[in-house]
Design a protein with these regions (language model features):
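HAD-like aspartate-dependent phosphatase fold
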Residues: 1-192
């Protein structure tokens, strides 16, 4: 088991001894690893195949998707959530990552912010003057999936908090798009 970050690469730079070491672990004549090899990372901003391709390029040995374990890889086992409406946030192609793990009903943080601009009381510069057009009966968010740290973590945290406080009523129901988020949170806290 090989950690990627800090062991094979530091930042974007491959550590000088890494390619040479992995050349010794891979038998090019047989086209097979001399020892079982798996690569792990706490990163969650890319797909396993992309990380395998990157490792193959860095180390000059073939690395398959099955040999890569990302921070989000275990979510594939949470099949009870795959049909639920999930809010996904993080960096990279979060919607594509979620769907590749089996989640079928996905809303991204950017989509939610666009549909309900009043929910984002942190980032006023990115707030839209009016919500995007959307289905009047926005489905209840039933789970939140975080793929690593979002770039704008404060906005993501604030909007996720509102979503998590939403276990009795949907914050995205018709007529709540322009509600004051703090009054909204207070209403749910008081009702608990």
């Amino acid at each position: 088991m090989f950690d990627i970050d800090g062991v094979i690469v530091r930042g974007k730079n491959v550590l000088p001894s890494a390619p040479e070491t992995f050349q010794q672990l891979y038998d090019h004549g047989r086209g097979a690893w001399r020892v079982p090899a798996i690569f792990v990372t706490n990163a969650g901003n890319t797909l396993r195949q992309q990380k395998a391709d990157q490792l193959s390029n860095w180390l000059n040995v073939p690395v398959t998707e099955e040999q890569v374990v990302m921070s989000h890889s275990p979510l594939k086992m949470f099949t009870e959530y795959h049909d639920k409406h999930v809010l996904v946030t993080g960096q990279g192609p979060v919607e594509f990552i979620a769907k590749s793990l089996g989640f079928r009903n996905v809303t991204t943080m950017d989509e939610l912010r666009c549909w309900f601009p009043a929910l984002d009381c942190v980032d006023h510069k990115r707030r839209r003057a009016a919500p995007c057009s959307f289905n009047q009966f926005f489905p209840r968010i039933e789970a939140v999936v975080l793929f690593g740290e979002p770039i704008r973590w404060e906005t993501s945290l604030q909007v996720r908090t509102i979503s998590l406080h939403n276990h009795k009523t949907n914050p995205c129901e018709r007529g709540t798009r322009n509600v004051d988020p703090m009054k909204y949170i207070s209403a749910f806290t008081a009702a608990d």
